[in-house]
Amino acid sequence: MSPPIQLLSPEIVNLIAAGEVIDSLAAVVRELVENAIDAEATRLTISIVPELWQVTVADNGRGMSLENLRHCAKAHHTSKICDLDDLWKITSLGFRGEALFSITQVGQLTIKSRDATGYQVGWCVDYNQQGEIIKEQTSPMASGTIVTASNLFGTIPVRRQGLPTIKQQLKAIQGMIDNMSLCHPQITWQVYHNHQSWLTISPGKTPQQILPQLLKSVHFHDLQFLCETIITPSQEQAKLEMVLGLPDRTSRGRLDWLKIAVNGRVVRSPRLEQTILAGLSRTLPKGRFPVSFLHFKIPPSEIDWNRHPAKTEIYLQSLEFWQEKVTEIIEKALKLSPLTITTVGQNQRVKKLLKASENKGVYNVGTSHVNELDLIKLRAVGQVNKTYIVAEHSQGLWLVEQHIAHERVLYEQLQDQWQLIPVEQAIILTQLSTKQVEQLERIGIDIEPFGENTWAVRNVPKLLENREDCPDALIELSLGGDLETAQVAVACRSAIRNGVLLDLAQMQDLLDSWKKTRNPRTCPHGRPIYLSLEESSLSRFFRRHWVIGKSHGI
């Protein structure tokens, strides 16, 4: 006979629920940090002692009164929602009233807090497994809250043994802090591991100032920050912020820094991630991935957070609308802007050029403030090695590689209009495999048998129409890839070759066309197209600030 179905005891129910919320040291840190941010803290101090299974989070937020301290660790007690309607108006990071109670189920909880609204003294409170106070006493302290969770998972040895290694848990904690610091750049973070300083993050006005502190290889001017105000389909106001690593300056070998946040929390959204990758398609070399942080600040009524205990999965209304806005903001970020046409990141290459003539001296190139009219007046003045166009503007000059600049122009033209035109005389190809024939048909080529191991092609991409190497280009197209790959191949083969002499008019035409492209920074293979040399950098190199003497007329 099967065992009878019984009602679980409250103790078992609570422990199961706690395991959904608190499953690691990182989860404890996450929940306490979210509470601190909800309390409007601007400074967080976190201490982790793995050997003691102890986490302490101190903040300078609003703090709690003794009355709130008596209820805050009880199950389903919260100040953030009151009724069912509030579930669709959530503006806080926490709202379920589960975190502190869940910590009491898996460890020992102590809270010190002082209400910021006029209380002269704080309170120190210890809790039992039911979230009830077992000890309370006054505690002199500044306004804010200090939460200590210790002996975590001590009553569940099987759970503790099944957790990742301490090293892995510390990595997870660092990743969580990285994410939260990007979402809340106004906060100062000080993190200790075994009482030794481990992480420090200074505050900033935007996440563009935070990201270089997290990725030491990335500089402030390697990044483009945009903030767009958007009217949603429900006619409410929202904001979309993006920090994008400019593809000609920084990238990653792994897809680990493509981050999406919604209303202060990093979330997983495969469809939005694919939208970002599609928007950055053909801007990075093969095997390289973008550095990107995208933050949606949208009305809470358009989000359902109540889908995952860690709130990392959400339902977002009008997802197609937001995908379109993401594509638009990426296009804007890739444009040549006044603040990013020359950079500290690019200057690493400039420094190598300038230092080739001397062993000492570092010439930093500052941020250019060339306005949009100056960009329009970019003027071709010469050609170097029949490869690089020398272009002058009011604050310096650029070196533009002619082949890949033209390749970018042609590629975007092909993207906008993939035009196949009939040819008067069929182009004969031989020794094609079945897969090659299928590939040509897949990209729209009209091909038919023309004898044994021979094929006749009746139409070709317009750019290849009058080229002598058109048969070779068709064979290249037959070797695989999607339509985008074919467009890149055609653009590359059709672009002006390096080693071709151009006159000033041809160079100027190319510069004008190149500046109008959606992504003038890199070619479709991900190579940088231009190098900027500021006049101020050249001036420092030639010591134009030196005072030699009046007799020299300087």
From Swiss-Prot:
Xref: PROSITE patterns: DNA_MISMATCH_REPAIR_1
SUPFAM superfamilies reported in the protein's UniProt record: ATPase domain of HSP90 chaperone/DNA topoisomerase II/histidine kinase, DNA mismatch repair protein MutL, Ribosomal protein S5 domain 2-like
Claim: DNA damage is one of the keywords in the record: yes
Stored InterPro entries: DNA_mismatch_repair_CS, DNA_mismatch_repair_MutL, DNA_mismatch_S5_2-like, HATPase_C_sf, MutL/Mlh/PMS, MutL/Mlh/Pms-like, MutL_C, MutL_C_dimsub
Taxonomic superkingdom: Bacteria
Any one GO biological process: mismatch repair
GO cellular component: mismatch repair complex
A Pfam family the protein falls into: DNA_mis_repair
Chain ranges passing through the membrane: none
Keywords of the record: DNA damage, DNA repair
GO molecular function: ATP binding; ATP hydrolysis activity; ATP-dependent DNA damage sensor activity; mismatched DNA binding
NCBIfam families: mutl, PRK00095.2-1
Role, per record: This protein is involved in the repair of mismatches in DNA. It is required for dam-dependent methyl-directed DNA mismatch repair. May act as a 'molecular matchmaker', a protein that promotes the formation of a stable complex between two or more DNA-binding proteins in an ATP-dependent manner without itself being part of a final effector complex.
PANTHER family referenced in this protein's UniProt entry, alphabetically: DNA MISMATCH REPAIR PROTEIN MLH, PMS, MUTL, DNA MISMATCH REPAIR PROTEIN MLH1
Family, per entry: Belongs to the DNA mismatch repair MutL/HexB family.
Name of the protein in its database record: DNA mismatch repair protein MutL
Organism: Crocosphaera subtropica (strain ATCC 51142 / BH68)
Gene: mutL
